[in-house]
């Protein structure tokens, strides 16, 4: 019975739960790796060994957090749980494919971990650039295993994307138009389109790298008429949409949380929000070379990518100000979920501002591969994506489990996390402006102070992670059941009870106008 339910599941709620548990577990691994990085950088001198080991840890940290924490939780966890409930569908369009999408991830994770245990590990950075990732600089199976890991994770995401697009387009009740679906449903659909269009390009790039390494092709080797810059174009054509894939479902969740705890029946500027997400999705595909300003692009190419990148600030601004307008004049309930959402809006905006700085190709020449870039993307990921996940988790936890979290503990958890991540990443802006480069395990003494502060901050964040485990335990141990849910008419996922029945609908639902 246990095996039938959890291994062969075709139920969107169970698969969503599996994704959430897998993502939480991977998040622990990713956090452990990040703490190893901060321990190494906590003082000058060597702690763990040479830079190969250090870079293996950095590479694994990136892959684990992106492919096994953020994406499984946001798209697999929240997406599977909420999308069918929000559109009134009995399940996903392809329930068995849904199961396969999940079960491709543990083997993928296993391959990634295996890559670090054989030979010297894949110390390439998450970008896996040749010639460093070639078979001379990285002899042995490590990079090959990492490539296979990415293949599996990519197939998983592509299948999931097909499933979500089909579900959202085809499984709405006849009376529900696309422009009446909740914003989270929109965000997942746009994310799925981005995945569908960008992942095949990554697959092509890493497959060519695989044949360069093992079959003597020369796609990325100038000696045989290849070009390593081609790899960078292929990688970043995936890599830039990927960062929007990581944040867009977060946008959707934040819209729901802000609307709910402002006591509003709908978000401010629904159509503007949809338009903004579609614009961000489209623009995300035509700005990739801003990651490559230092490789010798033509000056007019640099001018184009600078301008195009800055255009993304417009739809992003539409979203930020619409969230603020939703809050405006609302009957605000200061719940932990709203605190996460407010933290998201503030810190994501800071990250966006440093992004505008880096979009300038002339400035990026100086700041590229320094800690300024690390600070920038950790503000939008560690305080954007993660805050959205945490906000979504504490908001929908009663829906998933039927139990409520302890309000005070949850607020304390938010406060500790807020202090921790800011203390970790704010000083890194200063390090970057002073020229401290990324991906080095050691640094000159001049950088010591800010690194010490940053490392202390990382251990404050660790405290928050441990506290979160306690808070979840406390909720299950105390078993405070949900009494009432407000605003159910505009938040239909709550309409079916907390938690909803295993099969939401025994027969198709039709909404009469």
Swiss-Prot record:
Q: Which residues bind Mg(2+)?
A: 368-369
User: Per the UniProt record, which residue ranges are transmembrane?
Assistant: 12-40, 51-86, 95-117, 141-170, 183-212, 228-261, 270-286, 299-327, 336-357, 371-400, 407-433, 447-478
Q: Which Gene3D superfamilies match?
A: Cytochrome c oxidase-like, subunit I domain (1.20.210.10)
Annotated localization = Mitochondrion inner membrane
E.C. number(s) listed in UniProt: 7.1.1.9
Task: Check the record and name the Pfam families matching this protein.
Answer: COX1
Q: Which residues lie on this side of the membrane: Mitochondrial matrix?
A: 1-11, 87-94, 171-182, 262-269, 328-335, 401-406, 479-513
Enzymatic reactions: 4 Fe(II)-[cytochrome c] + O2 + 8 H(+)(in) = 4 Fe(III)-[cytochrome c] + 2 H2O + 4 H(+)(out)
Q: Which GO terms describe its molecular function?
A: cytochrome-c oxidase activity; heme binding; metal ion binding
Mitochondrial intermembrane topological domain: 41-50, 118-140, 213-227, 287-298, 358-370, 434-446
**How would you describe this protein's topology in the membrane?**
Multi-pass membrane protein
Query: So where does Na(+) get bound?
Result: 40, 45, 441
Q: Which residues bind Fe(II)-heme a?
A: 61, 378
Pathway the protein takes part in: Energy metabolism; oxidative phosphorylation
Q: Could you name the domain of life of the organism this protein comes from?
A: Eukaryota
List, separated by semicolons, the cofactors it needs. heme; Cu cation
**What is written in the cofactor note of this entry?**
Binds 2 heme A groups non-covalently per subunit. Binds a copper B center.
Where is O2 bound in this sequence?
Answer: 244
Q: What does this protein do?
A: Component of the cytochrome c oxidase, the last enzyme in the mitochondrial electron transport chain which drives oxidative phosphorylation. The respiratory chain contains 3 multisubunit complexes succinate dehydrogenase (complex II, CII), ubiquinol-cytochrome c oxidoreductase (cytochrome b-c1 complex, complex III, CIII) and cytochrome c oxidase (complex IV, CIV), that cooperate to transfer electrons derived from NADH and succinate to molecular oxygen, creating an electrochemical gradient over the inner membrane that drives transmembrane transport and the ATP synthase.
Family the entry assigns: Belongs to the heme-copper respiratory oxidase family.
Q: How does it assemble?
A: Component of the cytochrome c oxidase (complex IV, CIV), a multisubunit enzyme composed of 14 subunits. The complex is composed of a catalytic core of 3 subunits MT-CO1, MT-CO2 and MT-CO3, encoded in the mitochondrial DNA, and 11 supernumerary subunits COX4I, COX5A, COX5B, COX6A, COX6B, COX6C, COX7A, COX7B, COX7C, COX8 and NDUFA4, which are encoded in the nuclear genome.
Its name, as the record gives it, is Cytochrome c oxidase subunit 1
Q: Which organism is it from?
A: Osphranter robustus (Wallaroo)
């Amino acid at each position: 019975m246990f095996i039938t339910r959890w291994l062969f599941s075709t139920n969107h709620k169970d698969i969503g739960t599996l994704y959430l548990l897998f993502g939480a577990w991977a998040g622990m691994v990713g956090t452990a790796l990040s703490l190893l990085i901060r321990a190494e950088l906590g003082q000058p001198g060597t702690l763990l060994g040479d830079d190969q080991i250090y870079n293996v840890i950095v590479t694994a940290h990136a892959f684990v957090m992106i492919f096994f924490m953020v994406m499984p939780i946001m798209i697999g966890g929240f997406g599977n749980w909420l999308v069918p409930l929000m559109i009134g569908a009995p399940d996903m369009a392809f329930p068995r494919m849904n199961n396969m999408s999940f079960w491709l991830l543990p083997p993928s994770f296993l391959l990634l971990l295996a890559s670090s245990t054989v030979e010297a590990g894949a110390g390439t950075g998450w970008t896996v650039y040749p010639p460093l990732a070639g078979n001379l600089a990285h002899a042995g199976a490590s990079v090959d295993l990492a490539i296979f890991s990415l293949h599996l994770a990519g197939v998983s995401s592509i299948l999931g994307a097909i499933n979500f697009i089909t579900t959202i387009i085809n499984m709405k009740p006849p009376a529900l138009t696309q422009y009446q679906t909740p914003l989270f449903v929109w965000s997942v659909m746009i994310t799925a389109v981005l995945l569908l269009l960008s992942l095949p390009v990554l697959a092509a790039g890493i497959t060519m790298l695989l044949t360069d390494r093992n079959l003597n092709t020369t796609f990325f080797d100038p000696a045989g008429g290849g070009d390593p810059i081609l790899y960078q174009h292929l990688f970043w054509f995936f890599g830039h949409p990927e960062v929007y894939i990581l944040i867009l479902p977060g946008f959707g969740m934040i819209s729901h949380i802000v609307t709910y705890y402002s006591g509003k029946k709908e978000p401010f500027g629904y159509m503007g929000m949809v338009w903004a997400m579609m614009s961000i999705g489209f623009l995300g595909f035509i700005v990739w070379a801003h990651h490559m300003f230092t490789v010798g692009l033509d000056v007019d190419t640099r001018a184009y990518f600078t301008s195009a990148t800055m255009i993304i600030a417009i739809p992003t601004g539409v979203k930020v100000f619409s969230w603020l307008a939703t809050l405006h004049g609302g009957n605000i309930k200061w719940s932990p979920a709203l605190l996460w959402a407010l933290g998201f809006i503030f810190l994501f905006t800071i990250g966006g501002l440093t992004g505008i700085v880096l979009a300038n190709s002339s400035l990026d020449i100086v700041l590229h591969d320094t800690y300024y870039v690390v600070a920038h993307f950790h503000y939008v990921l560690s305080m954007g994506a993660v805050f959205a996940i945490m906000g979504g988790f504490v908001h929908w936890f009663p829906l998933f489990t039927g139990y409520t979290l302890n309000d005070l503990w949850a607020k304390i958890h938010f406060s500790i996390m807020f202090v921790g991540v800011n203390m970790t990443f704010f000083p890194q802006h200063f390090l970057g402006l002073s020229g401290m480069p990324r991906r080095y395990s050691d640094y000159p003494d001049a950088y010591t102070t800010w690194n010490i502060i940053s490392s202390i901050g990382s251990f404050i964040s660790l405290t928050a992670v441990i506290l979160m485990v306690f808070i979840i335990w406390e909720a299950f141990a105390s078993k405070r059941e949900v009494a009432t849910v407000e605003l159910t008419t505009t938040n239909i996922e709550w309409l079916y009870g907390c938690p909803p029945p295993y099969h939401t609908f025994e027969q198709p639902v039709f909404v009469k106008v």
